[in-house]
């Protein structure tokens, strides 16, 4: 399945759990996560969505580690099975 279709599936799954999901299209930082899932009184979830064979770039890995170093623990890489 195309990565964009898989991403829509992930968005629907998180919205069904009560999250407000924001898709980040263009940001001031390259390599930023694809999605942010928000729910009141909970830590945000930063999500990088990847297809079965699409590798995570070094910059995307750096951004994930950067978020973790800032104290965010919900930094996810979700890969299509």
Language-model features and meaning:
Residues 1-81:
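Catalytic phosphate/metal-binding cores of nucleic-acid and nucleotide-processing enzymes, i.e., regions
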């Amino acid at each position: 399945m195309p990565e964009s279709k898989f991403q829509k599936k992930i968005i629907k799954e998180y919205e069904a759990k009560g999250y407000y999901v924001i898709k980040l299209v263009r940001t001031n930082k390259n390599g930023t996560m694809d999605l942010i899932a928000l729910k009141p009184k909970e830590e945000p979830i930063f999500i990088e969505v990847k297809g079965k064979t699409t590798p995570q770039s070094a910059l995307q890995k750096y951004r994930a580690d950067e978020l973790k170093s800032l104290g965010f623990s919900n930094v996810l890489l979700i890969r299509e099975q």
